[in-house]
Swiss-Prot record:
Residues 8-277 form the tr-type G domain. This is Peptide chain release factor 3. One of its GO terms (molecular function) is translation release factor activity, codon nonspecific. The gene is prfC. Gene3D superfamilies: P-loop containing nucleotide triphosphate hydrolases (3.40.50.300), Peptide chain release factor 3, domain III (3.30.70.3280), Translation factors (2.40.30.10). It comes from Staphylococcus haemolyticus (strain JCSC1435).
């Protein structure tokens, strides 16, 4: 198979949603239908002892939530699919944002009872900013929810995107009978004991069935015909341009509508895209020279070995295990001998990968999030990945002073993951950690105890705003006050931590020569 044919067979996407919309469950069922796993677990499995394949971390299994992006690869038909299940919780949106930099399309999961929720809206905006095509899966049709037209209107009005229903539900909740498939004009029943039914060209039922006289069926047919008459033919270019989202109705937990979605996804989703660099060079996935970038680092995927994996998206050329690459940030060459693919925490050695593939590189501390790797003499670096400005800050120390070595190792590795941000006071070297939300600190504390055997003491700093400094040479000691604590971040940049907006404005008025800025 040629490089071009290999690249064209890749599909790489992330699943995004508000917490509890069914994102991780959908991931499980996609793996199940592809044959990648024999049994689909469920995130509700805290009581049963069964956990989602993508929720591999201990804290995820205990809480039944996703707090880190999982990477999984599987084959389906003639395609190789890379799927990234992202954290739904808003406190971990930075990890999700970085993950969205590594995919070519996204699947938006919506709870039919709740519609568009805040986290869904935030993540959709990132996809739109990046020009990522979006597929929509409206979930939990076997429960009572909003009417289909109401959901479509909400998507179109809130997200400013056209919708194209690929199927249409018959009933809802306890009266949910199934879905009408738009292309085949067939009815897929929700219950296994029912057979597939077919519609003729006039959308009349061809088989004899009791549902023929059901009011829910009559209403669904009427709505379906309105959709057909009002809508145009499916426009794949509009999808790829982010102007239209194909909509699928189903129930991930019940294994219903998932395979229909997967079949349509591989038909319509884009192949790997070209990538922009800081030097304004566009790198084609078909370029012969290998290139890739690190978008995620994860420590302790195997707690027994304290390993560290750097996740790399291949952008161009072919990766071969054992090849020499250059880390652009340091200009140092290295031979990559340990590379792996994933089914959550299950790993398999990767000898070959092409554009669109996500592979794990064993990391001894060489890599940082955003690093560019190249196989030839390329001089470019891919565009930087987003970093958020924290809103909560805590002083952190080890409860047991004899555990300092483990404490500092844990801090170093979890900070390098991007799970939490690191600061240090100038004169006392007090460690201060910053996070977007409180749950990040809870997960940090849990992981320090379970992965590094260190109990930590955390104390609020009383600061809510971090601002970086453009002109660091103008900083003076008198600026380090009770209202404006001066610290350094992990890259040795100066940062002021302020109590509130009032303190920030007071500082800017008192020291107008200092130019402050925030991250995302």
């Amino acid at each position: 198979m040629s490089l071009k044919e290999e690249v064209e067979s890749r599909k790489t996407f992330a699943i995004i949603s508000h917490p509890d919309a069914g994102k991780t469950t959908l991931t499980e069922k996609l793996l199940y239908f592809s044959g990648a796993i024999r049994e689909a677990g469920t995130v509700k499995g805290k009581k049963t002892g069964k956990f989602a394949t993508s929720d591999w971390m201990k804290v995820e299994q205990e809480r039944g939530i996703s707090v880190t992006s999982s990477v999984m690869q599987f084959d389906y038909d003639d395609y190789k699919i890379n799927i990234l299940d992202t954290p739904g919780h808003e406190d971990f949106s930075e990890d999700t944002y970085r993950t969205l930099m590594a995919v070519d399309s996204a699947v938006m999961v919506i709870d039919c009872a709740k519609g568009i929720e805040p986290q869904t809206l935030k993540l959709f905006k990132v996809c739109r900013m990046r020009g990522i095509p979006i597929f929509t899966f409206i979930n939990k049709l076997d429960r009572v929810g909003k009417e289909p037209f109401e959901l479509l209107d909400e998507i179109e009005e809130t997200l400013n995107i056209d919708t194209y229903p690929m199927n249409w539900p018959i009933g809802m909740g306890q009266n949910f009978f199934g879905i009408i498939d738009r292309d085949s004009k067939s009815i897929e029943p929700f219950r296994d004991e029912e057979n597939v039914l077919h519609l003729n060209d006039d959308y009349e039922l061809q088989e004899e069935h009791a549902i023929r006289n059901d009011s829910a069926f009559a209403q669904a047919i009427e709505e379906f015909m309105l959709v057909k008459e009002a809508g145009e033919e499916f426009d794949n270019d509009a999808l790829l341009n982010g102007e239209l989202t194909p909509v699928f109705f189903g129930s991930a937990l019940a294994n219903f509508g998932v395979q229909n979605f997967l079949n349509a996804y591989v038909d319509h989703a884009p192949m790997p895209n070209a990538r922009q660099t800081n030097e304004e060079v566009e790198v084609s996935p078909f370029d012969d020279e290998f290139s890739g970038f690190i978008f995620k680092i994860q420590a302790n995927m195997d707690p027994k070995h304290r390993d560290r994996i750097a996740f790399m998206r291949v952008v161009s050329g072919a990766f071969e295990r054992g090849m020499d690459v250059t880390l652009q940030r340091t200009s140092k060459k290295q031979k990559i001998t340990r590379s792996t693919s994933f089914m959550a925490d299950d790993k398999e050695t990767v000898n070959h990968a092409v554009a669109g593939d996500i592979i794990g590189l064993y990391d001894t501390g060489n890599y940082q999030i955003g690093d560019t790797l190249v196989g030839g003499k390329q001089k470019y670096s891919f565009q930087d990945l987003p970093q958020f400005t924290p809103e909560i800050f805590m002083k952190v120390s080890a409860k047991n002073v004899m555990k300092q070595k483990h404490f500092h190792k844990g801090i170093e590795q979890l900070v390098q993951e991007g799970a939490i941000q690191y600061y240090k006071t100038l004169h006392t070297n007090q460690i201060i950690l910053g996070a977007v939300g409180q749950l990040q600190f809870e997960v940090f504390e849990h992981r320090m105890k379970n992965e590094y055997n260190v109990d930590v003491v955390m104390e609020p700093v009383g600061r809510k705003i971090a601002r970086w400094i453009e002109n660091e040479d103008d900083i003076q000691d008198k600026m380090n006050t009770s209202r404006s604590i001066l610290v350094k971040d992990r890259y040795d940049n100066f940062v002021f931590l302020f109590e509130n907006e009032f303190a920030t404005r007071w500082f800017e008025e008192k020291f107008p020569e200092i130019k402050l800025y925030s991250l995302l």
